[in-house]
Structure formats: C-alpha cells, structure tokens
Amino acid sequence: MANDQNKDYDKIIVLDYGSQYNQLITRRIREFGIYSELKPHTITAAEVKKIAPKGIIFSGGPNSVYDEGALGVDEDIFKLGIPILGVCYGMQLMAQRLGGDVEPADNREYGKADIEVTDASAKLFHDLPKDQTVWMSHGDLVTRVPDGFRTTATSVNCPISAMDDDDRKFYGIQFHAEVQNTQYGHEILHHFAFDVCHAEANWSMDDFITKQIAKIRAEVGDKRVLLGLSGGVDSSVVGVLLHKAIGTQLTSIFVDHGLLRKGEAEQVMDSLKGKFGLNIIKVNAKDRFLNDLRGVTDPEKKRKIIGRDFIEVFNEEAAKLNGIEFLAQGTLYTDVVESGTDTAQTIKSHHNVGGLPEDLKFKLIEPLNKLFKDEVRELGEKLGMPHSLVWRQPFPGPGLGIRVIGEVTEDKLEIVRDSDYILREEIAKHGLDKDIWQYFTVLPGIRSVGVMGDGRTYDYTIGIRAITSIDGMTADFARIDWDVLQEISSRIVNEVKHVNRVVYDITSKPPATIEWE
C-alpha cells in the first residue's frame, strides 16, 4: 500500500535500525488495528511531518551508537512533538542524542531477563506487575539518562532497563517488547499506542482489500498481468485478489518445476482454475530445473538458479502472449526483511525478491509485500477462498529444492515427497494441523548405518521440522506427543525407500530459520 492510500488511517511508523525483529514491531501495532509501516532511519523530519504519524518507534539494531558510521536520526524529529519509543538500540540512540551516556556493557545480555518496574506512575507499565520477564539482546547500555528523563525499570545487568520523559513523550526500553518472550510486551506496546499516542484503531483488512483493488486497477489500467502460481497460499491469494480486481486481464502461469509436494500440481489446477475460474497455463519445466540444479550444493546458488529459471520461463511464456506488461508475485513482508534491507544483515535471499535479473522485462506488482502470513490468510478468507486452501501449509518459492540439503536429484525429491506426505497425513489424523503453524520433512544428506530385517543398511536420515508461530518472524518447535512422533517415524522408515532413521528438529527461531536452507 502506498502512503497516499493510508491518509485515512492513524499510523505509527517504525524507523529501521537493522534489527531482524523490526518487522515484528509493525505487526504488533497492526494487531491493535493501527496501521504501521517500516521507514528508513534516514527519513527526514519534513518527511515524517508529511506522513503525520501518531507515534514513532526507533527499532533495535546490531550495531553500537559509537561505531564508525553508526546509524543516526534527523534530530529535528525530536522537535515535532510526536511521541517516540526507542527499543534497544533505539533507546540508546535516543539517550545519546539527547545528552545521556551509553557505554559497552560488562556482560552482554541475550535472552530472558528479569526487570523491576521502579516507578508505578510510568505510562508504559501502567497496571502491570512490578516484576516482569523480558527478552534482552544488547551489548551496550544507557549509563546516564538525559536531562528530563527518569529511570522506570531496572535489572541486575542493566540498571537502566527503561526510561521516559513524560513531558516530551519520549520513552525507551532496553528490551524487546515485540517478541513473545517478553511477558507483558503486548501491554507495553498497547500503552504506547493508545495511552501515549492516542491512536485510533481504524485500519482493517476490509479497507485493505478495497484500497488494494483500487490501486491495482489504477496501476494496471487496461494492460495484462502475468502471475506465477507456486501452489502455495501466498500466490493463490494474489491470484484471487488480482482476478477480483482485473478479471480476464490476468493470466496465471503454473510452473511444475518438479519441486512440488505430492499431488500438489493437481490440487492447484482443480482449486484455482476449476473453482475460481482463473486463466491458468500449466508449464512442465521439471527437466529444465533439475538439469540446472545438477551438481549445485550451495543453498544460495540453488535459490538464485530457481528464481532465475522462474523468470526465464515467464519471459518465454509471456513472449507467446500479447500485451503482458506486469508480473505479479506473492512477496510478503517477512520475505523482504529476511532478504535484508540497507540496515539489516541478510540472513538468506528469498525466491520472490532475490532471483530477479536486472533486465526484468516486466513491471512488478507485489500486493502482499506489506502483509504478514497471518494477515494473508485473513485476506484469503475475506476474499471467499475456502478454509482448506487458505490454511494450507506454507511452502517456499524454491519448493523442495531447499528441503533437499545439497544436490537435488529426482530420487532425493521422491524421498522428501513421500515422507512429507506421511507427516501431513499423520498430523491431520491426530487433529494437530490447526495447532502447528508449519510442518515438513527435510533430507539433510546424512546417511547412517541401520538394521532392517536381518540385514545391514546404510541409508538416509529424514528430519522433521514442526513449529508454532504467529507470523513466522519468531517460532518455537512444536511439542508433539511422543507416541505420535513414534507413529510418524515408524511409517516413514517402513514406507519410504532408502530411509532408516528419523530425527526431530527442536530448534527455535532464532537462532535457526524455519527452513533448513
């Protein structure tokens, strides 16, 4: 959504200082019904004034305010009379620029910490317990608050864990209120948004649909749009939204690249072409993708190859059509942040944003690139899509190509397909499909000795990844009952050829990402 489409909404903007959590802050604010968007830290006071936000949040970041070339702020922003909340690095930056002191911590803090609220009148902590558990992630700390500020919370390793200047409506927290690990993070952000900023909850998905359709129609005019369908939730929702906006001007290409889940190609054609009437061209490009991936083991190279091949297929198919000017993609907000911004450290490139060539022949339309996964599901249901389609398991653009660790071969793909199908069957059979946010199998490329029947085997290991999450930015491993896991393991080793061992991934995000590659 462009800014001019959001003038009717109260909004709180988040300045980007490079934290991988910064998109989470915008998500939390949107959960209150307040529109929020990330802005570069280089934004000027004049630009902020034009946006007219109800509040500003300085995000965290990986650097020190004393680093050479440290990320700063237009100090005139402090003079606008707009409430500001500094989070982690954002608090340190606020303290330094307003005359306080910031120094390296004797002990870096990463993880849970206990704080004590020292001033019961502090607005951020109104009606909250004195003792709280929060999530810290910092190497520096504020050692002296600026004039006009007071300390409002403290901890053993961080004596100034929170501060405020109520008169100027400046607030700082050294911890991350946006992550689920902070006990009262939701309430703290709620206090800032409503009690400090006095923002009104007037942003909704219904409004998003109305304005996004108007935007698409204005941008596309009478031209034609090409959409790449992957079979996942994101591209399917884009297809239905575009079809609602421009009807027959949309042509969808479904590339069967040989990296899909079992039965997925048939399901895509039946659901979107049969039930929604989308014009879909199916392209069998399996041999092309597998040939280009032969011998490639580096995950970044695999992603780039898959992204490149997608675009090349689109170019070739578009050349057969007349009047195609736009390419639509199902890029999400999380795709953008994990691929890195000017200030964020790149974790991994995403298929939707990392594989595009400089000579792209189309103008891009990415109607979901400001939405999180749970918002996309809400959008799909608002558009009348069936629950079963909207709540399908998330599936990465590169497909099973990044669930086979190392070189991708047809034999390895079959192992992942068959094991993943068993996992999905068992999860559904035990009624866990609504509780587990995402679950899939992965082939790590590890072979080990086993015994099957009376003989020795030397076969592959299958990894199971099952996580709980709200928006994909942070995640925890799902606590699946041991008996269910045993049943899944037994079926996989008995029904999937060349597998003699099953392991369960019990790593959270962070430090791991959801996908293995």
From Swiss-Prot:
The keyword ATP-binding applies. Residues 203-392 form the GMPS ATP-PPase domain. One of its GO terms (molecular function) is ATP binding. It catalyses: XMP + L-glutamine + ATP + H2O = GMP + L-glutamate + AMP + diphosphate + 2 H(+). Its EC number is 6.3.5.2. SUPFAM superfamilies: Adenine nucleotide alpha hydrolases-like (SSF52402), Class I glutamine amidotransferase-like (SSF52317). Residues 11-202 form the Glutamine amidotransferase type-1 domain. The keyword Mitochondrion does not apply. CDD domains: GATase1_GMP_Synthase, GMP_synthase_C. Pfam families: GATase, GMP_synt_C, NAD_synthase. InterPro entries: Class_I_gatase-like, GATASE, GMP_synth_C, GMP_synth_GATase, GMP_synthase, GMPS_ATP_PPase_dom, NAD/GMP_synthase, Rossmann-like_a/b/a_fold. The active site is at 88 (nucleophile), 176, 178. Keywords: ATP-binding, Glutamine amidotransferase, GMP biosynthesis, Ligase, Nucleotide-binding, Purine biosynthesis. Pathway: Purine metabolism; GMP biosynthesis; GMP from XMP (L-Gln route): step 1/1. ATP binds at residues 230-236. One of its GO terms (cellular component) is cytosol. Catalyzes the synthesis of GMP from XMP. PANTHER family: GMP SYNTHASE [GLUTAMINE-HYDROLYZING] (PTHR11922:SF2), GMP SYNTHASE-RELATED (PTHR11922). Homodimer. This is GMP synthase [glutamine-hydrolyzing]. It comes from Lacticaseibacillus rhamnosus. The gene is guaA.
